[in-house]
């Protein structure tokens, strides 16, 4: 996989800094290096395949994610990317709901209830919302600065919107 932009560099730096929101800033043509060796999802993990395909292993179960499909990774799950096609392009969003817990309230309780009803580590599906998830990744990257209070609050609202979108899928 070749990388055509600095989205992977930004994502890897966000992950190294343990930021609440780590996103690829749109499509990227590579995966973070840590994804190839049992990476732990702290809270919410989303990988949208926009072209090609890749294989992901979660707790010794392998899944194939094709173009226009999304892998949803559960909290505290370990996963590894086991292979990918040369034309693979993905959008990655990892975030902690703690940063918006005060806004979400009962929605978080509902999400935990759903996790108890369906405790799978990974779901792979075509949601029909892949282009919207890609757009969220791009929007979350805009104005990514702690110095700008407006941008920080806008990111929290985008994260809230993304969370509600995910609950509707």
Regions found by a protein language model. Name each.
Residues 60-61, 85, 150-151:
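Short, solvent-exposed loop/turn segments at secondary-structure boundaries
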